[in-house]
Amino acid sequence: MGQAGRERQHMTKVTHEFDLFGKHYALESGELAKQATGACVVRQGDSEVLVTAVVSKERKDFDFFPLTVDFIEKMYAVGRIPGGYLKREAKPSDHGTLVARMVDRPIRPGFPDGYKNEVHIVATPLVIDEEHLPDTICVAGASAALLAGGAPFDGPAACVRIGRSAETGEFIVNPTVTEMETSDLELTIAGTADYISMVEAGADEISEEDMLAAMTFGQEAIAAFCEKQSAFLAKVNPTPMTYTIHAADPSVAERVDAHLAEMSAALKDADKAARMGKVEQLKASIIENDFTEEERATWGSD
C-alpha cells in the first residue's frame, strides 16, 4: 500500500468496545493523530488516553534499539489549569516517568533483534475520572498503536493491575480507586499472551501461594486483553511496513567468546581496583589482537 492508501487507512475510524472482568473498555483509531505511524485512544470507564507511535522510515546507525516512551500528563485531563505564575505544563513528574517505564518494559522485547529504526511512543491522558487509573491501559494503547501502524512489533501486549477484594477474597482486574482502598494486594503485571515481561507488587503480608495465584490470574487476564486487541486489529487491517535488520558478523561473537574463561577469572578477583584493571586490560588485548585496524575504525573501540 502506498502513502495515499496508508493515509486513507488512518482516516477510517475504527472502534472496538468490550467488557472484561466487570469493567468496560474501548479501543479506537483513525480519528486522532493521523500524521503518526499509528495511534489509538484507549478507554476504561471515563478515563481516556491517546497513545501515538511514530516509527522512522530509515534505519539509524546505533548500537542499540532507539525506543523512546513518554507519558505526558496534562492538567486539563482532570479539569484543571496550572496555577501560580507559570501557566505552562511542568516537566514530567516522577509518576509520569514510572508510567513511561511501565510501557517500555513490555514493548521493547517485542521488536526483532537488530531493529534500529527510531520508535517514539507518546501517551497523553485526555480525560481522567476519579476512579479509573490511566497507567495500565497505556500499554494496550501503545501495542495497538504500533500494530495498527504496521510496525514490526510481536504483539499484542497488555498490562493489568491485580487487586483482591477484602470481602470475597477474589482477585480484581484493574481495580478502581475505591476498590484499591480495601485491597491487601497491588500487583502490576505486563506482557503478552505467552510470557510475562514485567512484575511490580506491593502487598500486606500475603502468602507466597496467594501471590503466585495472583500472577497466574494476571497472565490469564493479559491473554484476554490481547485477544480483544487482536479483534480490534482485525477491524483495522493494517499493512505491515518494510524494514531491514542490522545483522552482526557472527565471527565477532566467536572471537569474544574465546576469552570467556579469562574474563571469568578476572571477575572473580575480590579486590575491586585489581578486578577492574584486569577487565580493562583483557578488553584492550582482545580489541588489539583479535580485530583488524579496519574493524576497529568501523565499529569503534567499544
Annotate each language-model stretch with its function.
Residues 94, 98-102, 116, 137, ...:
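Conserved active-site and cofactor/substrate-binding residues in soluble primary-metabolism enzymes
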Residues 15-19, 26-28, 40-43, 50-52, ...:
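Structured core elements
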Residues 150-270:
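Mobile "lid/hinge" segments at catalytic clefts and subdomain interfaces of large enzymes
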Residues 1-10:
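Short, Lys/Arg-enriched N-terminal segments with co-localized hydrophobic residues
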Residues 10-56, 60-66, 241-302:
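Extended amphipathic alpha-helical scaffolds
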Residues 82, 86-88, 98, 102-103, ...:
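Small-residue-enriched alpha-helical segments and adjacent helix-cap loops
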Residues 36-120, 125, 132, 200, ...:
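Glycine-rich, flexible beta-strand/loop modules in the N-terminal catalytic cores of phosphate-handling
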